[in-house]
Each structure stands twice: as C-alpha cells, then as structure tokens.
Amino acid sequence: MVNNMGSQFEELFGDRINLINLNSNYINDIHEYSIIPIFYKYLEYDCFKSIDETKLFFNKICSKSNDIDCHYWMIYSVEKDKVIGTIGLHDIDWRKGSAELTYGLSPNFWGKGFFSESLNLVVEWFFNLKNSNSLFLKTYGSNTGSVNSVSNYGFKKEGVLREFYLDEKTNVRQDAFIFSLLKSDIKK
C-alpha cells in the first residue's frame, strides 16, 4: 500500500530479527506466547485461552493493517525461525508525519535486545520517509522494561495519562506514560 509520504510498507531486516508482513502461517507462534500469563502483565485484557482467540486477535490486526493509517509487522527471530511478537504503527497522520508505535514481545525474549532491535528498524524506516516528523507511544508507568528501553533509545517522556489503563482482570486503573521521538532527536 503506497502512502502520500512516498513509500509503502515493506519488510525490514535486522541482525537477529526481521520485521515481516502479517502472515497466518505464523499463527501458532503467536499463540505460543499469547497463552503465557506474564505477557499480559502490561495489557488490559486477559490471557488468550484458545487458538480461536489468537486467530480473532490476528484477524483484527490484519484488518487494521489494511488501512492507510495503520501497519503491523511480525517480529521474526532469525535464529529461532519463529515469530516472537508484533510491532506496529497506528494513527499514522501522513500530513503531519506522525504515528503511534505499539508493540508486544514474547516474555521469553524480554530483556535480550529484541525489542530494541525492532524499535530501531521501525524508527529508521519511518524517519527515512519524506515529511516524517514524530513517533509517540503509551506504556504502563509500571512497565520499567519498556520505559527504560524507549528512554535509552532517545524517546522523551511527555507526560502521564492518569488512570488511563483499566485492567479487565483486576479492575485496577494504572497510569500511562506518554513518550515521543522527533526526527530531529535522532543523532546522525
């Protein structure tokens, strides 16, 4: 799909991971980490209990990814030969050159640099588009792994959405931290 910033969404290739287009052949890989309870620690909904729930989620992101203002990639581990997460751009505003970054990574790969490599690929790709200017993301304030990763990359904390998240499992509200990165923040 071609956008008005002169590019189309493409697969991105790193050292240990590739960001590949959505492909239902990897639904079992997605299901494998979607049934791990700790994966949902920083998500508002409960652990998937069946392959059908995973397929429903996959179909939902496929449907969104067909829109001009959204795209998801699957995070594919070259060494493990499997999908270990997803990363995407939402609410892409091609006129302003902005987008929201979203992501989810298998807990089996937390703290090992896979998210940082995925983040780098998406940021580099996005900021190489003409007219691109800013990326932003929301994360649980208590998600220190995510907060540290995006801060170390250069994202700046812009603010807090108080009690933004509502956990369906516990009915507990938590703050969301808002981070942003401008093209001008990237050191050449």
Predicted regions mapped to residue ranges:
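Acyl-donor (CoA/ACP) binding surface of acyl/acetyltransferases
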Residues: 1-28, 33-36, 76-188
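Conserved GNAT-fold acetyl-CoA-binding loop/helix
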Residues: 38-60, 71
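A generic membrane alpha-helix/interface feature
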Residues: 53-56, 62, 149, 172
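Short loop/turn motifs at secondary-structure junctions and domain boundaries
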Residues: 63-68
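Generic hydrophobic, aliphatic-rich segments that mediate packing or membrane embedding
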Residues: 69-71, 85
